[in-house]
Amino acid sequence: MKPVVTGILGGSFNPAHGGHRRVSLFALAALGLDEMWWLVSPGNPLKPKAGMAPLAARAASARRQARRAPIRVSAIERELGTRFTIDSLRKLQRRWPKRRFIWLMGSDNLAQFVRWKNWRGIARLMPIAVIARPGYDSAALASPAMAWLRRFRRSAASIRNRAGW
């Protein structure tokens, strides 16, 4: 039996919008994912707190955007007691050891990925699918993170076929 493959899109979702939904539906199809999880972050250490809606409001906006789609909205990071992506992903893998996870991020995040805590550890922990975002692709391709991540490149077809897993 093949393991369930889950895409994870983390973020502030302040608010969630159609772009989050479109990216998720695209990734589900392109990568052959079984489901998508949206992790609504209690707080992003790289974003200012000013103007950030309460977690409950952001989770509610995410649930509205995720309706009638194989997208599960969760604020599990609060329960896990994690603040950084690397810690959240490690705990998710421990909690669901038979599940395969793929981290999704927009090219805007790849452009500044080196600012994330233990970003290389995230790449070693699970595959990362980078979704193009207009206006950010050049910066992402030229980023120090991309220079390091190139060694891990896989095609969407190899991920769909679970090659090397």
Where are these regions (language model features)?
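Nucleotidyltransferase catalytic core that binds NTPs
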Residues: 1-165
